[in-house]
């Protein structure tokens, strides 16, 4: 029960911070999620605009720190990720309710998009490092992307 209480407290703190600070970093998630929600129903979404929103959201949540390979790239490196998460096959993930997380389709789609993003970033990270990096792409980065674009998973940090 302690873990659940911690989760509830963290969510409450996040919510209170977002409401108390008009231009606080907590709002960057809200802006990112909103533009992706609108884009899901747009027959021709502006991928460049969405990539910029995603990049700023990721930067405001620490994913563009000095040790991050993303810091060496501009926001357009996220274009293929944006195109991927907007595919109709991931509609079942968008804002998924907790009760639906056990559905096999939801689990399959979540696993697929997670590993597709990881596979995309792997070679980019290797190129920035100038060598093959043995470790996997950060789950924190991938889950922050999924949280900001689909709202289907909390960030694992």
Predicted features, each with a name:
Residues 1-134, 152-155:
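An N-terminal alpha-helical hairpin/helix-loop-helix interaction module that forms a charged
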Residues 127-147:
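Helix-hairpin-helix
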Residues 143-157:
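Ampipathic, surface-exposed secondary-structure segments
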């Amino acid at each position: 029960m302690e873990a659940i209480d911690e989760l509830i407290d963290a969510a409450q703190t996040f919510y209170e911070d977002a409401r108390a600070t008009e231009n606080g970093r907590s709002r960057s998630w809200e802006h990112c999620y909103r533009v992706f929600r609108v884009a899901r129903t747009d027959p021709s979404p502006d991928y460049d605009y969405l990539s910029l929103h995603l990049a700023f959201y990721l930067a405001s949540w620490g994913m563009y720190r000095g040790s991050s390979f993303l810091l060496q790239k501009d926001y357009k490196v996220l274009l293929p990720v944006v195109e991927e998460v907007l595919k109709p096959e991931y509609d079942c993930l968008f804002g998924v309710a907790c009760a639906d997380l056990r559905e096999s389709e939801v689990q399959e789609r979540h696993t697929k998009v997670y590993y597709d993003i990881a596979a995309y970033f792997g070679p980019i990270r290797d190129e920035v490092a100038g060598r093959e990096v043995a470790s996997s792409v950060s789950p924190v980065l991938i889950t922050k992307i999924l949280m900001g674009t689909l709202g289907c998973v909390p960030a694992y940090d």
